[in-house]
Amino acid sequence: MSSRYSERNGLSETEKMTLPKVRKRKAQLVDEIEALKNEVREVDEELDQVYYTHPKSKEYHKIVVNGRKKFNQDPWKALDWLASRNVVAKDPQALALWMKAGEGLSKSAIGEILGDNRPFALETLDRFTKEHKLHDVPIVPALRQYLFSFRLPGESQKINRILEKFAEVYANQNPSYGNADQAHTVAYSCIMVNTLLHNPNVKDKPSLEKYIEMNEQLLEKGAITIEQLTEVYESVSVTQFKIPDEVSTSGKGTVNDILLHAEREGWLFKQSSNPLFSGALSWKKRWFVLSENCLYYFDQMTDKEPKGIITLANVGIRKVEAPSRPFMFEIFSLSDGQIKACKTEQDGRLVEGRHSIYKICAVNDEDMRSWINAISRMMAPQQHLLARPKSTH
């Protein structure tokens, strides 16, 4: 029995007619998978081509830049990489100085290190806080200065641990102020009144008199004075404590600003949006940066301007079940309209995006899930949807 006969045996006429198309599509999928594997290998080779060089060389500068990106993406995972490339030693004092300088570092990533309760992190928090010069600085401005050097974590235990260290260092540098317990009470009071006065979800804003009344027990214990409460209230009511990621010193929208506030960065593959392309759309490797409610993508990691910007407003995100690309997810419009976005054309023109869905592919399952989670967190303050996986055929 011939292989040709065996292959077609038992097939209907319709199935026999369809078979060549199936074979052709199978061949296309094999080619696409192989192309993706090649692109992934190229990315891995680029990331692996890192080696020790002289601190003043151009190659070393590239290593430092790459190290900052890794730290911003996953600070704990990056520590060994940074130490092995002689960027910063895995030592609390060295890391504290590096984070205090803060050049190109995400303040959220710094806060992630400082808020941890591992012994290494606690020692780093101590060294980092002691690097702040708080002598003869009033406590409220001192706390502003301190909290602007990183982003305070959201968990109450981490906040309290960081404020305790600040209070300890402040009291040591200002012996005439009082003890660390009193400094901690004032610092915590700053955070509390900042929330009461400036959080839009708090409808009943307390007056100074009401605020003093709320702290009656602390006053009775001598943990704080009316003068200190008044100083805190008047300062914070005029100028709220700004989260570092809410402000910029380098001009909002510049690459430096985008990278400074980056929550995640890395190589991903974006489906081509060329409407003239026939058949399956091509995939392009792009350097993606998640920053300040936007997803930026660049042709190269070192580009000065983004190729495109996707605004994460009124959008959802979900995994896409696609056998040919198992690590795909998509950002889609919740209103069935166009997603607010823009891109730079080849002639340099900036044009508005015209898409309701952006399909993106990661290199592995872990990377895909990390991106989905990071984008979901970025969308959390807004109305968003983390949808069930979507199947494609």
UniProtKB/Swiss-Prot annotation:
Alphabetical list of CDD domains matching this protein: PH_GRP1-like (cd01252), Sec7 (cd00171)
A biological-process GO annotation: regulation of ARF protein signal transduction
Listed GO CC annotations: midbody; nucleus
Region annotated Disordered, chain positions: 1-21
Domain called SEC7: residue spans: 53-239
Listed Polar residues bias regions: 1-12
Entry coiled-coil feature ranges: 12-54
Swiss-Prot/TrEMBL keywords: Coiled coil, Guanine-nucleotide releasing factor
UniProt GO MF annotations: guanyl-nucleotide exchange factor activity
Pfam family, one: PH
Ranges where the PH domain occurs: 261-377
Keyword Coiled coil included in the entry's annotation: yes
Function: Promotes guanine-nucleotide exchange on ARF. Promotes the activation of ARF through replacement of GDP with GTP. Plays a role in cell shedding during embryogenesis, probably by promoting the endocytosis of cell adhesion molecules.
Protein name per the record: GTP exchange factor for ARFs 1
Source organism of this protein record: Caenorhabditis elegans
Gene from which the chain derives: grp-1
